A protein has these predicted regions:
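Membrane-embedded alpha-helical bundles that constitute the cytochrome b-like, heme-associated redox core
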Residues: 1-123
Length: 123
């Protein structure tokens, strides 16, 4: 029968390395989304039933365009961090690396497409 201390049981399991920084980024993006999501819902909801020309004119104003762009950027950044953590915890081997690269590419591409669409409408 072996008596192991908590430290001895944890030896060899790896370190958290950048876990604190990742947690901080997720907390900041969560607070950002907590503020931006209601703003986005109210600005998008206001323009939801408008005719096309009125909606384009509405999003040509700076406030709705900025709220939309910030929501896109912070939302996709938060998505990337959360899904990357999920993949790192539950997927192993080559699939892990491929899924992380795919997630990063998807999140940056979707954020860029969303920002491009809003900027194109705003200008």
């Amino acid at each position: 029968m072996a008596f192991l201390t908590d430290r001895k049981r944890a030896t060899g399991m790896g370190s958290a390395k950048s876990g604190t920084l990742h947690h901080w980024h997720m907390m900041v993006s969560s607070v950002g989304l907590l503020i931006l999501t209601p703003l986005f819902i109210f600005t998008f909801g206001y323009a939801l039933g408008m005719p096309y020309e009125d909606a384009v004119a509405f999003y040509s104003r700076p406030f709705p365009a900025i709220v939309g762009i910030l929501t896109m950027l912070v939302g996709w950044f938060h998505f990337k961090g959360g899904v990357q953590t999920l993949i790192e915890d539950y997927v192993h081997g080559l699939a892990r690396k491929a899924l992380i690269i795919g997630t990063i590419c998807l999140s940056y591409a979707a954020a860029a497409a969303g920002v491009f669409a809003i900027v194109r409408i705003a200008l």
